From Swiss-Prot:
Pfam family, one: MMR_HSR1
Residues given in the record as GTP 1 binding sites: 9-16, 56-60, 118-121
Any GO BP: ribosome biogenesis
Subunit structure: Associates with the 50S ribosomal subunit.
GO molecular function terms noted in the UniProt entry: ATP hydrolysis activity; GTP binding; ribosome binding
Residues bound to GTP 2: 184-191, 231-235, 296-299
Gene: der
Role, per record: GTPase that plays an essential role in the late steps of ribosome biogenesis.
Keywords, ordered alphabetically: GTP-binding, Nucleotide-binding, Repeat, Ribosome biogenesis
Family: Belongs to the TRAFAC class TrmE-Era-EngA-EngB-Septin-like GTPase superfamily. EngA (Der) GTPase family.
PANTHER family per UniProt: GTPASE DER
Name listed for the protein in its UniProt record: GTPase Der
Domain KH-like: 352-436
């Protein structure tokens, strides 16, 4: 599971600015998808080979927070689920009573806490940090989040407190088969669906806590295929599941999505598509995971209601045209068995392997059917393509002036590859690389022989 970093502090100390610094590497990934709603309260990031997840507790609790509700339920939940807490204070304003109150609360949590003094640009950092030593969290770390100064050093300090990336990845990799995360807002029927699936199985392992945060990895087998179900709802007995008391955890959901091969998004057909559903789907798309959308509680809807839901899916989720959509009833089991065939198809598409030769031929056929546009009178040239990764499939295309290729042509290429590779249920990502111009930055200097020849030609021209 990805390590979780919680940003804690009173309002206006720079939590959101630091959040943007720590997650900016992912901002551009979904910018081209119309209709996609993103939530800026939590998100994944990476520094070098160190992946992590950031939770902005200020955003979770509301920016108009007061000292009384600063440690409200959602903020406390984020702290409970975090591996490291970054306690932000304002170096310009100095130590306040609110800072001291937050420090007292954090000391009772038993969490790894780094004290971060923000807004140290333009002030004496040593002097600004001196009074914060009294909070008892060790040496403060100075940063200027607005300019990004000190952020890399801060993340190195965070990294030193956490297990190595290989250990984090090994925890998920030790679970067999296709890992499936069932996500959805409370009361959408996720728990009923999970219990329906497990109730049908004859080979079900004991529920084993996957992490200290109680996400559950449940191995089981169906039709000879091994699966591991990632349940984000915590440790619970199957006989005691009550959806009404199910708690929605953003952190557990994000971790489950990251650990999964395929995500099954459960929607409530009777309530339609909510803003929270769109946020979750945006996170899945951001992570590049294969996706099956299960529209639950389909039984009991009349034909007009079903048509309305289908129209709403097309209208509100145009960016999920690649995803498999299944209509089910978790309570009665209708359509549940068919989910696994679609999960397997999505998994196979996400982990497809394609040769460079085949991808280059597909690129050439795409250009024959619809050649790249002219840019400033010159045509963009695309030379060859190769695979750059799996889950999601990444296709790297090399050429000239690729950075000037319009988004419409990139979408055309994406659809062309998807259609000819028969990819179902997985997003596809294209990366464009422009070859270096060997003459860039060089002056066109004549050789001595060329200079002599030029002089002769000029003398000859003057005689005429």
């Amino acid at each position: 599971m990805l390590p979780v970093i919680a940003l804690v502090g009173r309002p206006n100390v720079g939590k959101s600015t630091l959040f943007n610094q720590l997650t900016r590497s992912r901002d551009a990934l979904v910018a081209d998808f119309p209709g996609l709603t993103r939530d800026r309260q939590y998100g994944p990031g990476r520094v070098g080979g160190f992946p992590y997840m950031v939770v902005d507790t200020g955003g979770l609790s509301g920016e108009a927070e007061t000292l009384d509700n600063l440690m409200a339920r959602q903020t406390q939940q984020a702290i409970d689920e975090s591996d490291v807490v970054l306690f932000l204070v304002d170096g310009r304003e100095g130590l306040t009573a609110a800072d001291q109150a937050i420090a007292r609360s954090l000391r009772t949590q038993g969490k790894k806490v780094l004290l971060v003094v923000n807004k140290t640009d333009g002030v004496d950092a040593d002097q600004a940090m001196a009074e914060f030593h009294a909070l008892g969290f060790g040496a403060p770390i100075p940063i200027a989040a607005t300019h990004g100064r000190g952020v890399l050093g801060l993340m190195n300090a965070v990294h030193a407190l956490l297990p190595e990336v290989e250990e984090i990845q090994a925890e998920a990799e030790r679970w067999p088969g296709i890992r499936i995360a069932f996500v959805g807002r409370p009361n959408a029927g996720k728990s009923t669906l999970i219990n329906r699936i497990l109730g049908e199985e004859r080979v079900v392992a004991t529920e084993i806590p996957g992490t200290t945060r109680d996400s559950i990895f449940i191995p089981f087998e169906r039709d000879g295929q091994q699966y591991t179900l990632i349940d984000t709802a915590g440790v619970r007995r199957r006989s005691r599941v009550h959806e009404a008391i199910e708690k929605f955890s953003v952190v557990k959901t994000l971790q489950a999505i990251d650990a999964a091969h395929v995500v099954v998004m459960v929607l409530d057909a009777r309530e339609g598509i909510s803003e929270q559903d769109a946020h979750l789907l945006g996170v899945v798309l951001d992570a590049g995971r294969a996706l099956v959308v299960a529209i639950n509680k389909w039984d009991g809807l009349d034909p007009d209601q079903r048509d309305r839901i289908r129209h709403e899916l097309d209208l509100k989720l145009p960016f999920l045209d690649f995803a498999e959509k299944r209509f089910i009833s978790a309570l009665h089991g209708t359509g549940v068995g068919d989910l696994f065939a679609h999960v397997k198809r999505a998994y196979d598409s996400a982990f497809i392997k394609v040769s460079t030769n085949h991808l280059t031929k597909l690129l050439e056929s795409a250009m024959v059917a619809h050649q790249p546009p002219l840019v400033s009178g010159r045509r963009v040239k695309l030379r060859y393509a190769h695979q750059g990764g799996q889950n999601p499939p990444i296709i790297v295309i090399h050429g000239n002036m690729t950075e000037r290729l319009p988004g419409s042509y990139k979408r055309y290429l994406s659809n062309h590859f998807r259609q000819h590779l028969k990819l179902v249920g997985t997003p596809i990502r294209l990366e464009f690389k422009t070859g270096e111009n060997p003459y860039a930055g060089k002056r066109n200097v004549l050789t001595p022989r060329q200079q002599y020849k030029r002089k002769r030609m000029m003398r000859h021209a003057k005689k005429k």
